[in-house]
Amino acid sequence: MTVGVFAALGEEVARVRECLGGVGTERAGLTFYVVSVGALQVVYVCGGVGKVNAALCTQLLISEFGARVLINTGIAGALDERLCVFDVLVSVDAVQHDVDVTAFGYQKGRIPRMDSVEWTANTALRYLVREAFDLCTRDPEWTEGACALSGSGDPPSRVSRLVEGRVASGDLFVSDAQTRARIIREFGAHGVEMEGAAFAHVASVNGVPFVIIRCISDGAGAEQDVSMSYKEFSTRAARRSALLTLRVLERLSALRTSVVASLFPMVVV
């Protein structure tokens, strides 16, 4: 079985490359790294920021490399008050907060001719992420540099938290309270970033199970200076997301073929 891993930024995939290596293959000006992890073939790519780049990479992972399970790893801004810097958001579903065709009677976020606003993540993959997270929290590399979101009142040593919820994506970096409040009000999202929903859209229309893993890097406009928070925490948050992704790959590689077939019935193994 081939698992595709997409990240937007170099720091979001750096730890994966350190651990897995792989042979680079060029497609559309991007380098896709192919490597065996147990019985799995893993293909991972740093594809660039934004929804178009996410869609491009996701389709290439499916069409060119035969990915039958997809993981999007990276960082996000927190919209849920339970989430602090270095906590983890795992997608229940994903929406595009910058799509607006309401002038023609469509619900905010809904693309014409699509059945719904949201793209739903695979339940079995979410379970594997939760299992992997439990393992990560016992890893010294994971706990190094733990810190709560500035102003939250939580001590720097607080235990990392995993929250499952809605990921909202759009082609803008959310850094002001007004935009933040709008996304929460209109979509009930738990975190915001710039790629996940496009990744989820392409995975879904191809019938490929997916999950989005996001480590929180900032408060998406909740703090006084979001750019300062992002610059300070993004690299470490990205590393955590990559560590969690590696653990998920380990869990997937340990599954028997019969188990994979039962968990992902549409997957050819």
UniProtKB/Swiss-Prot annotation:
The lineage of its organism: Bacteria, Pseudomonadati, Spirochaetota, Spirochaetia, Spirochaetales. Belongs to the PNP/UDP phosphorylase family. MtnN subfamily. Keywords: Amino-acid biosynthesis, Hydrolase, Methionine biosynthesis. Substrate binds at G77, V174, M194, E195. It comes from Treponema pallidum (strain Nichols). This is 5'-methylthioadenosine/S-adenosylhomocysteine nucleosidase. CDD domains: MTAN. Pfam families: PNP_UDP_1 (PF01048). It catalyses: S-adenosyl-L-homocysteine + H2O = S-(5-deoxy-D-ribos-5-yl)-L-homocysteine + adenine; S-methyl-5'-thioadenosine + H2O = 5-(methylsulfanyl)-D-ribose + adenine; 5'-deoxyadenosine + H2O = 5-deoxy-D-ribose + adenine. Pathway: Amino-acid biosynthesis; L-methionine biosynthesis via salvage pathway; S-methyl-5-thio-alpha-D-ribose 1-phosphate from S-methyl-5'-thioadenosine (hydrolase route): step 1/2. Its EC number is 3.2.2.9. GO terms for molecular function: adenosylhomocysteine nucleosidase activity; methylthioadenosine nucleosidase activity. The gene is mtnN. PANTHER family: 5'-METHYLTHIOADENOSINE/S-ADENOSYLHOMOCYSTEINE NUCLEOSIDASE, 5'-METHYLTHIOADENOSINE_S-ADENOSYLHOMOCYSTEINE NUCLEOSIDASE. It is an enzyme of class 3 (hydrolase). The keyword Hydrolase applies. GO terms for biological process: L-methionine salvage from methylthioadenosine; L-methionine salvage from S-adenosylmethionine; nucleoside catabolic process. The active site is at E12 (proton acceptor), D218 (proton donor). Catalyzes the irreversible cleavage of the glycosidic bond in both 5'-methylthioadenosine (MTA) and S-adenosylhomocysteine (SAH/AdoHcy) to adenine and the corresponding thioribose, 5'-methylthioribose and S-ribosylhomocysteine, respectively. Also cleaves 5'-deoxyadenosine, a toxic by-product of radical S-adenosylmethionine (SAM) enzymes, into 5-deoxyribose and adenine. One of its GO terms (cellular component) is cytosol.
